[in-house]
Amino acid sequence: MVNIMEHRHVISALVLNKPGVLQRISGLFTRRGFNISSITVGITENPQISRVTIVVNGDDKILEQVIKQLNKLIDVIKVSELEEKKSVQRELCLIKIYAPTESAKSQVIQYTSIFRGNVVDLSPESLIVEITGSEDKINAFIDLVKPLGIKEMARTGITALARGPKILKPKS
C-alpha cells in the first residue's frame, strides 16, 4: 500500500474584483471534491483586483490539479503556491474567554501579553482577546486558555504574501 503524504498548501490567486468570482472558485472545489481548510479574500492595491488566499490539504497531485483548475476560470488572473518558508502567513483570531473573577481576568491578560495579543473587550464575566500570528501561535494560545473556558471564537483564516522582492502580479 502506497502512503501518500498530505501537506497543507497555501494558494494565492489574483482575481477580478466582481460579483460571482468567489462562488465560481468555491464551486470548482465542490465539484472536484476538494476541501477548503480556509479562504480569505480582500482587495489589493488595485481596486479592480482581489487576492484570494486558499488553504487546502492534500498531496502534490491535488495541489497541481487545483492550480490548473483555478487557472482555467475566466476571472482568475494569476495563481501561485506560497511555500511556508518563502512567505509570510498570518491569521487573526478573536476569542471570548470566560473570566468571572479578577484573578481569572489577570491570568488572561498575562497570557495575552506573553502572546503579544490585545484585550479588545472587557465585560463582568469575560474578555475578548485578539491574537494575530501563525496558525501554530494561535493554536498554542487556544490550548493555553481552553481550561479557563472559551465561550466563543472566530478565526479569519490565513492570509499570505511571498517574502522578498517576488510578487504575484497580473501578466502585462
Swiss-Prot record:
In its keyword annotation, does this UniProt entry include Lipoprotein?
no
Protein's UniProt keywords contain Magnesium: no
Q: Which GO terms describe its cellular component?
A: cytosol
| Domain ACT per the UniProt entry, residue ranges | 10-84
Output the superkingdom of the source species. Answer: Archaea
- Output the Pfam families linked to this UniProt entry: ACT_AHAS_ss, ALS_ss_C
* GO process annotations (BP): isoleucine biosynthetic process; L-valine biosynthetic process
Q: Which UniProt keywords apply?
A: Amino-acid biosynthesis, Branched-chain amino acid biosynthesis, Transferase
- Which Enzyme Commission number(s) are listed? 2.2.1.6
Q: Output the Gene Ontology terms for molecular function.
A: acetolactate synthase activity; acetolactate synthase regulator activity
- Broad enzyme group: transferase
What InterPro entries does UniProt report for this protein, alphabetically? Acetalactate_synth_ssu, Acetolactate_synth/TF_NikR_C, Acetolactate_synth_ssu_C, ACT-like_dom_sf, ACT_dom, AHAS_ACT, AHAS_small-like_ACT
| Protein name (record) | Probable acetolactate synthase small subunit
> Per UniProt, what is the name of the gene that codes for the protein in this document?
ilvH
